[in-house]
Amino acid sequence: IRETVGDLGCEIEIEPGRNIVGNAGILLSGVVFLKRGEGRDFLIVDAAMNDLIRPALYQAWMDVSPVQPRDGEARNYDLVGPICETGDFLAKDRELALAEGDLLAVCSAGAYGFVMSSNYNTRGRAAEVLVDGDQAFEVRRRESVQELYAGESLLPT
């Protein structure tokens, strides 16, 4: 940058974010229920917009794959979370062969996943696991409901 604009007399800092670590994160989510609708089928999963807001906020495309591929007829689904909001979706219009209880990998969920997550609807933020080769380390545990209320106080009676 200095070669192009010269010495500006200041320190230049950059924040590369998603470009470096976006593809390093995967959100795992379980299929809770398959709901057939009129003209549209839904996969209700246990992750929600509070865990990964990018699809709802930016209409970001997230690649979604079953952790264990299954034989059978693939259907077109919208992946939605358990929060009762029209924006609670992780992916739309995906061709997948799945059953209740299957585990899904929502890819490219790194970079800003945790910092953009929230406790909306009293949902604890997801755990974070670092995988290095064949080793896995829990680097942040899932928040409990008790932890969400820990900083609150009752009013005196």
How should these model regions be labeled?
Residues 9-157:
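Charged (often Lys/Glu-rich) extended helix/loop segments that serve as interaction or gating elements
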Residues 1-7:
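Alpha-helix-loop-beta-strand connector modules within alpha/beta enzyme cores
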